Curated annotation (Swiss-Prot):
It comes from Oryza sativa subsp. japonica. Gene3D superfamilies: Tubby Protein, Chain A (3.20.90.10). Residues 33-57 have a biased composition (Basic and acidic residues). It comes from the Eukaryota. Residues 1-96 are annotated as: Disordered. This is Tubby-like protein 4. It holds the Pfam family Tub. InterPro entries: Tubby-like_C, Tubby_C.
């Protein structure tokens, strides 16, 4: 019996089985990868295999994924859709929302029971155009004329020599210095002041009077007439009178024309007014002017629409008018107020600020006069609106000539006033 050859024994190790298994697993993975590469290889000859037979192309299987089932709408969406369809049907049928009474008011109810706003009311019909002259002058366009003033029908002589009727109210005039016009008329070097009516927008202003200023022996003198002919010839029918002052300019006297026949016989004139200026009033905050005027009282009151004759002045102020003040009307200047913004004294012209489009400028020559001390109604006022241009408002019992002379006395330069 033959002896069997034995292999030498290997040392037993705990990692021997693990190493062997890893080796076998690696070989199997390599073989599988190699087979996969062979499957993915593109054959160089289509239709021929290794054995020479025809090779079929690979079959491509299209996998169709079924669409996802639609989502089921929620109960809220179903209800909203039903309400929209219901509203659409109501609109097609022409049904209008219901109207309910809530707290005594009509409220339109929608299809869902909601309150709807009522439609706005229709616009009111346009107002008819006014047929009278009661509307204001500033409501007119540039091409329309302002309504005629209540004194527009009075002639020039009546405005100058007769008191303004009570029912006329206030008369507005413009005083302008016209040196160039005087030079053109042959009176070179003589200052002329012209008085114009302010008829309003779109109307022709009337020239009422002209005043010539000159100095005689240091005193101011104004010769007033309706035109230039009366200025240079006092016997002309257009001559109205003169305004003269004392040496320092503290007192002015208004002389009227009077009856020309009586003047030739007695060589006397009628005193139609006196204007007195007090020395400049000086206070801790500044200074301002103060003035007074006296005019004859009228015999009666005249109305524009009455059939009675025009009233006339009495024979002027009597010689003892200062002792008999009852025969004269006294006009007092209104005290100005101190403006903290401009730091000076000013008068309140807001009453006439929007009328006729003129803006009164601050000036020491501006004034407002009333019939009583601290009276409320303004009888005469003067306001500066430009260089050597003033606006004048006067009312009963003044005449246009008296109002012009009082304003010229304030415009004239004087020694008694430091302003």
């Amino acid at each position: 019996m033959a002896a069997t050859k034995r292999e030498p024994l290997r040392p037993i190790s705990s990692n021997a089985g693990t190493v062997e298994r890893r080796a076998r697993g690696g070989a199997a993975a390599a073989a599988a990868a190699k087979e996969k590469e062979k499957e993915n290889e593109v054959p160089t000859e289509i239709g021929r295999g290794k054995d020479g037979g025809e090779k079929k192309p690979p079959v491509v299987v299209a996998v169709v994924v079924p669409p996802a089932p639609p989502l089921k709408p929620s109960s809220l969406q179903v209800r909203m859709k039903a309400e929209e369809e219901k509203e659409r049907e109501e609109e097609e049928e022409g049904s209008s929302p219901a109207v309910a009474l809530v707290a005594g008011l009509q409220v339109r109810m929608g299809p869902r029971g909601r309150e709807l706003l009522l439609p706005p009311p229709p616009p009111p019909p346009p107002l008819p155009l006014p047929t009278s002259s009661s509307y204001e002058a500033w409501d007119l366009s540039d091409n329309e004329a302002a309504p005629a003033s209540s004194w527009a029908t009075l002639p020039n002589r009546a405005l100058l020599c007769r008191p303004l009727p009570l029912d006329v109210g206030r008369c507005t005039c413009i005083i302008a210095k016209e040196t160039l016009a005087a030079a053109a008329a042959g009176a070179r070097g003589v200052a002329l002041y012209s008085l114009y009516t302010n008829e309003g927008q779109g109307r022709q202003d009337r020239k009422l009077a002209v005043a010539r200023h000159r100095r005689r022996r240091g005193r101011s003198e104004f010769v007033v007439a309706q035109n230039l002919d009366g200025i240079f010839c006092t016997s002309d029918k257009n001559f109205l009178g003169t305004l003269s002052s004392n040496l320092v300019g503290s007192r002015y006297r208004i002389w009227g024309q009077g009856n020309r026949v009586d003047e030739i016989k007695s060589q006397s004139k009628r005193l139609l007014g006196v204007v007195a200026f007090a020395p400049t009033v000086t206070t801790l905050t500044g200074s301002f002017r103060s003035m007074r005027a006296w005019i004859p009282k009228n015999q009666s009151i005249h109305l524009k629409n009455s059939n009675s004759a025009q009233i006339q002045h009495i024979s002027g102020l009597p010689k003892d008018w200062q002792e008999k003040k009852i025969k004269a009307d006294q006009l007092c200047s209104r005290s100005p107020f101190y403006n903290n913004m401009t730091k000076r004294y000013e008068l309140d012209f807001r009453e006439r600020a929007g009328r006729m489009g003129y803006k009164v400028q601050p000036s020491v020559k501006n004034f407002q006069m009333t019939l009583e001390e601290k009276g409320r109604q303004t009888i005469l006022q003067l306001g500066r609106i430009g260089k050597s241009k003033y606006i004048m408002d006067f009312r009963y019992p003044l005449t246009g000539y008296q109002a012009l002379c009082i304003c010229l006395a304030s415009i004239d330069s004087k020694l008694c006033c430091t302003l």
